[in-house]
């Protein structure tokens, strides 16, 4: 896994007053008609049925007695990160992380329950309020000092363009292009850094087009109002999958990092049970099926580990 480098999950921040030197297009105030909008949540959410996944007795035996007797894994998740974990139309938790958790529960003979939480408050509550945290957590040294983490997925930054790539976008070169992205995320910094690099090399700067939501940014690219969409790879992959073939991905996933399921440090038996269940889902093909339903099979890993370095 030497190609996997630490990276943080994109977090929404307050709307910035300025975004560096990149030329700022008036995208935030632009109107998008509902009939044109490529809204992931507005489309039917994938229905993933994990009921056919059978319990594996030798793996279920690894679960600590207290949890096994309770019969349920309690998960803490910040339900604001589609397609990983978000609130569905019925008010319940949905997303590929929620489906993966349910599949892990099937393998271990446990029910699962997800409670909505503030992202920053999940790790401190692991082992007391929550058994696990599966909420698009990037594995990094700082988190590994506090908790154990079981790898199950890889994510990074990726790109999408209008189908056919009419503007000839060749990532990572974005010089002179109109770049659409969701405002208030790590992509704000990416645009500024790329713009500065373009200008330092004597090239054209980036025309920055920030949007309040990723769906509006995707719509701008599909409609030719922007040249390229950038964002976290799970978000971009899901946007492409839901775009009715109006978008396609280009380039490679950059700055790939492992995501991990958070487990308390004093629960090594539970961490090993989770790891073994994830590996079973990898080997059986069930994990790939879940991720494919959400357009994110590119995030597959071959081996699950506890506290990978």
Regions found by a protein language model. Name each.
Residues 93-106, 137-139, 156-213, 228, ...:
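Bilobed "Venus flytrap"/periplasmic-binding protein-like clamshell domains
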Residues 32, 37-57, 106, 165, ...:
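Extended ligand-binding regions for polar small-molecule ligands
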Residues 27-30:
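C-terminal motif of bacterial Sec signal peptides marking the signal peptidase cleavage site
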Residues 137-144, 192-193, 222-255:
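A ligand-binding cleft/hinge motif common to bilobed small-molecule-binding domains
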Residues 111-173:
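Acidic, polar ligand-binding/catalytic clefts
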């Amino acid at each position: 896994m030497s190609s996997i480098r630490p990276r943080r999950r994109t977090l929404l921040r307050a709307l910035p007053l300025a975004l560096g030197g990149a030329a700022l297009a008036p995208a935030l105030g632009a109107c998008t008609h509902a009939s044109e909008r490529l809204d992931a949540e507005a489309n039917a959410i994938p229905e993933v049925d994990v009921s056919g996944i059978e319990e594996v007795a030798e793996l279920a035996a690894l679960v600590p007695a207290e949890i096994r007797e309770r019969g349920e894994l309690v998960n803490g998740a910040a339900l604001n990160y589609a397609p990983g974990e978000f609130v569905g139309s019925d008010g319940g938790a949905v997303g590929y992380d929620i489906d993966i958790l349910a599949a892990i529960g099937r393998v271990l003979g446990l029910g699962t329950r997800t409670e909505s939480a503030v992202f920053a408050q999940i790790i401190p509550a692991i082992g007391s309020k929550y058994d696990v945290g599966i909420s698009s957590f990037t594995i990094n040294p700082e988190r590994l000092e506090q908790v154990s983490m079981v790898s199950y997925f890889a994510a990074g930054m990726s790109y999408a363009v209008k189908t056919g790539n009419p503007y000839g976008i060749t990532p990572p070169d974005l010089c002179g292009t109109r770049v659409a992205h969701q405002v208030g995320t790590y992509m704000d910094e990416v645009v500024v850094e790329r713009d500065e690099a373009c200008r330092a090399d004597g090239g054209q700067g980036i025309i920055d087009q920030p949007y309040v939501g990723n769906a509006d940014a995707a719509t701008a690219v599909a409609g030719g109002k922007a040249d390229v969409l950038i964002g976290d790879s799970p978000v971009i992959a899901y946007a492409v999958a839901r775009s009715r073939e109006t978008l396609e991905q280009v380039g490679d996933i950059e700055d790939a990092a492992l995501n991990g399921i958070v487990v308390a440090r004093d629960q090594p038996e539970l961490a090993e049970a989770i790891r073994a269940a994830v590996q079973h889902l990898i080997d059986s093909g069930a994990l790939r099926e879940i991720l494919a339903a959400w357009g994110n099979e590119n995030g597959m890993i071959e081996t699950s580990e506890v506290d990978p370095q």
